[in-house]
């Protein structure tokens, strides 16, 4: 098993509201990233699911995905930045930079700690886990993030 971590991204220069980017880039970024409310304990690299719909401010609330808890799956993306304790930016798809150690072409899954792993989660006897592929390694440090929204249930 090879564990890899998501690198923190400073998205202030890449947000859709930034006037330095053109309309095409703005539209692309709207599909790749979204701002969300998250728990203070959530960290960069945690895969998350939508836990409640849009607030009046147009912000989703996300919570950590746990393969042992079916109601928290599937994950829709990964936290790539936190602008405050409870405000985060989630990347939903596209190229993602990690800490390295990945094998190009290998599939990557959500681990039991909501982080990235190169093997599916293993259920204990009489346990169920939801196995979700979230991307494919493009290189040692790059993952093509594209969460499978139809994960598989594994039985122990």
Residue ranges and their predicted role:
Residues 2-8, 13-156:
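Glycine-anchored, exposed beta-strand/edge motif detector
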């Amino acid at each position: 098993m090879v564990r890899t971590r998501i690198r923190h991204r400073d998205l202030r220069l890449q947000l859709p509201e930034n006037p330095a980017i053109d309309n095409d880039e703005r539209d692309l970024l709207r599909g790749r990233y979204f701002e969300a409310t998250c728990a203070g304990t959530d960290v960069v690299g945690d895969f998350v699911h939508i836990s409640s719909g849009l607030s009046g401010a147009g912000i989703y609330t996300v919570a950590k995905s746990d393969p042992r808890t079916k109601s928290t799956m599937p994950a829709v993306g990964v936290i790539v930045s936190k602008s405050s304790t409870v405000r985060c930016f989630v990347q939903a798809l596209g190229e993602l930079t990690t800490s390295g150690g990945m094998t190009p072409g290998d599939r990557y899954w959500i681990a039991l700690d909501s982080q990235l792993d190169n093997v599916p989660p293993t259920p204990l006897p009489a346990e169920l886990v939801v196995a979700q592929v979230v991307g494919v390694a493009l290189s040692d440090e790059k993952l093509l993030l594209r969460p499978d929204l139809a994960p598989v249930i594994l039985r122990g």
